[in-house]
């Protein structure tokens, strides 16, 4: 970390701050200098966090012969090719225009093989027809383009995608045999990236033109390629600077997108990895997506809908545990994403037995947890933001979650298949929200964060109809004894004990720090507080090394 110099005109000398003292000093004195941390407004009114279901389970029946309980989900869409007019439409390579690629299994050339040889104008003509077919009405929904065969950034096409680099270089050499390999490679890179950009950019433009009420974006964008579960002692899941730079270079893509669809799928390596390893990977990937969402306009960020699965990608019959849900869904909610898309393959509904397993998992594990985080997030939004923004971690790296206090709440599944929430929040619960979370205002709203929780008298939030917390705020904690040990609250009681060893990052650009300090200490009526804090730092030897 570089030197932070603060020269106070009244002190007549320069003081250098560092380490813990610098962080404490900044957090105490410069909240007014921070740029407002905005989030995209809800896609659906009164649904601050969107749950979406993107799995082919429409024919599944549960134990009682009834369809799966999807009451917590606001948008639905089956990936099956014959499904149209859905809340979520996912476009694979075989159902959206003439996407050029090489079949990874057979090596067959499809629509020109590489983007430079792809029929762009024919693609757009076909694209128009298929958009109108799959989206007969322009209702509010998600339009997700899943093109994974090649990436628009040349250097990200590593094995086995390096075939696109190889074929691009071969094309240039066939057209210009006089070029040496180095020059041919450089030209191939330029040609490939331009053609890839044209295909992806023009596809988004036409989609937005024809169906403007849908939110358009590409699955897996952005990504930061932090997949190293097997090195928890060496690797903290951070996104490498080079990958952040490459994401920055895709500004044209973020400009044309109206939503981002990153992914936090876990493999079985994550199952055997430490809790922190899984947590780091998900946390950093979502944090990078939120950073990218602000590239087009930091005051009007793009919504982030994070794709997740209920199973491990390479063990499709093994559901995620309670703790895995905390490390995925819990992280996503606490970081302030716009929603989650649960994707699933046909294996979820391949037989009556698999449908029954899914039904049981949803009733006993998934849905109670979704209710828990939904109610906690809505409660925080209501008391902290007056519902004009969403609660996000004050610093993105600590292990603070939007969970109901397990000592005060219990979520019960009744014999009739409906859920009931027992308990009430206390002043201490609300103060914990205020301590660990901040209010990120919705775009174009100048919301004010409540700081005194003593003024909150009641809380009225619902996860779904008749699954609500509608009560007054209790003055002190009263331990609630759940009737059933399957209550989700007690399972969460240990999740906040995880200690993160990652370095805390300042939630604002360092270049603005010294200017903010100068302005505050010039105009603050508490100048001697500034002086005393600086003096304390000097006394205790907090100098930069």
UniProtKB/Swiss-Prot annotation:
SS bonds (residue pairs): 60-355, 224-239, 380-391, 385-439, 441-468
Q: What is this enzyme's class at the first EC digit?
A: hydrolase
- Its GO biological process terms? carbohydrate metabolic process; cell adhesion; fusion of sperm to egg plasma membrane involved in single fertilization; hyaluronan catabolic process
Membrane disposition: Lipid-anchor; GPI-anchor
> Its GO CC terms?
acrosomal vesicle; plasma membrane; side of membrane
Glycosylation positions in this chain = 82, 180, 372
Q: Supply the alphabetized keyword list.
A: Cell adhesion, Cell membrane, Disulfide bond, Glycoprotein, Glycosidase, GPI-anchor, Hydrolase, Lipoprotein, Membrane, Signal
The cellular location(s) given in this protein's UniProt record come to:
Cell membrane
Record Pfam families: Glyco_hydro_56
- What GO MF annotations does this protein's record show? hyalurononglucosaminidase activity
| Key word Hydrolase present | yes
Q: Which reaction(s) are listed as its catalytic activity?
A: Random hydrolysis of (1->4)-linkages between N-acetyl-beta-D-glucosamine and D-glucuronate residues in hyaluronate
Main location class: membrane
UniProt entry tagged with the keyword Hydrolase: yes
According to the record, the signal peptide region is 1-35
Q: Which residues form the active site?
A: 148 (proton donor)
| Functional summary from the UniProt entry | Involved in sperm-egg adhesion. Upon fertilization sperm must first penetrate a layer of cumulus cells that surrounds the egg before reaching the zona pellucida. The cumulus cells are embedded in a matrix containing hyaluronic acid which is formed prior to ovulation. This protein aids in penetrating the layer of cumulus cells by digesting hyaluronic acid.
| Family label | Belongs to the glycosyl hydrolase 56 family.
Record's protein name: Hyaluronidase PH-20
Q: Which organism is it from?
A: Oryctolagus cuniculus
